[in-house]
Amino acid sequence: MVETLVTIRTARHGDEIKIADVHDAAWRDAYRGIIPGRELERMIARRGPAWWRNAIARGSRLLVLDFDDRIAGYASYGRNRVPALAYGGEIFELYLAPEFQGVGFGRRMFEAAQKDLADHGYRSFLIWALAENVRALGFYGRLGGRIVRRAPEKFGEETRERVAFGFD
């Protein structure tokens, strides 16, 4: 029998390359055909290892899911960036490498971020998703989120709708 260790922990120095790899793969999988190609490439390129190294060094709230010594996903979160919405916290990003999706790791990452937000006084929080990202909409809906706001988001010359899920 083979045992595989799955842990969720705070990102640390040395994780930046693996987080950047997950970001690249997850964004290509989630947004190809939704975000215009050139814009998608530009957005991915901005989030290379140096960006993640700086986020870790700044002490950003950033969790990673470590599966058998491989970073399979990450979540970043903190204070809500839209004060007009009455939610204290926000999960900014929650992504898994495509090969780790659909096995419960996303829920585990969500619950870990939710717990840390609550531990820091944020009992309610938001998560934004693009309206065309059907998998994300289903995922956040199954977790109990309800759509509380719709807003446009520009990607180059094109506009897409994004939706905010509220969790109380």
Over which residues does each language-model region extend?
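Acetyl-CoA-dependent GNAT
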Residues: 3-6, 10-16, 21-99, 107-112, ...
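Short alpha-helical segment within the catalytic ATP-binding CA
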Residues: 104, 108, 135
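Active-site acidic-Proline motif in GNAT/NAT acetyltransferases
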Residues: 97-99, 103, 131-132
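Conserved GNAT acetyl-CoA-binding A-motif
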Residues: 118-128
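Structural motif
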Residues: 22, 120, 142-143
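Conserved acetyl-CoA-binding loop of GNAT-fold acetyltransferases
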Residues: 141-149
